[in-house]
Amino acid sequence: MHLRIITFLLLIIGLGACSTKKNTAINRAYHNTTSRYNGYFNARELMKERVQTLRDQHKDDYSQRLPIFIYPDEKQSQSMYDDMDVVIEKCSEVIERHSMYIRRQEKVKWIDDSYFLIGKARFYKQEYGLAEETFLYVYQAYKKIPERYQGLNWLIKTYIEDKEWDKAEEFLDLGESEYNKIPEEFKGMFNAVYADYYLKRDKDVPKAIERLENALKFTDDKFHSRRYTYVLAQLYHEQREYAPAMRYYRSILKMNPDYTMRFNAKISLAMAFDVSG
């Protein structure tokens, strides 16, 4: 497989397929392939590694409502600076060398992904103003691809963390107006972000519950499914709705959580049972 890729690259380089100004099939093939197998892949893997490290090092306080999302505090953010700068540098090089933005349409499929990674790197560095600019660009510039809604989700996340409540609400409303256009793979996150907005503004716990339950319907990965489920159990428990709280605590026990989450789910389940009558 790797030999085929190398042979293909050598062939198209030999044919002089380096222009980013001419929309030809061979130019698109060259820049799609080289952007994917050069900086973008390395940047994506580095981002995955650092986010996983952040999750592994995170310690939840089960005496409090768990946060829906795990973000770095100031000290953790600073520890990520060097790696996030590498992500930004690699993705910026991909964009500079391989972008084919012709007639208001990007012809290279990894360019929007590179912008998105730059936005995430800025988010984790807590450079919220720069992150907002990047995610807004992804959402507005790539109107013909579904990944624009990934940019929208992270744009709203950024507004929430930056306490730009009016802007967060504006783009939540915008996302809601386009809800039927959002691909299912991004609907789970959109609903979870909506729930996060309600909870961080202390606005409406029942609506947050509704959004998190919707998020679960569209969420496949175990990490987020477990987290949404535990927060739902806590929210129902807080509302003294013990039957659904116990149902979600029991669900957690079937989802292969880590020892700490399992232990606290059992304790909370017993407490909910005791007061449920």
For each feature predicted by the language model, list its residue ranges:
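Acidic, polar-rich low-complexity tracts and alpha-helical solenoid repeat scaffolds
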Residues: 18-277
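N-terminal secretory signal peptides that target proteins for export/translocation
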Residues: 1-2
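Sec-dependent N-terminal signal peptides
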Residues: 5-14
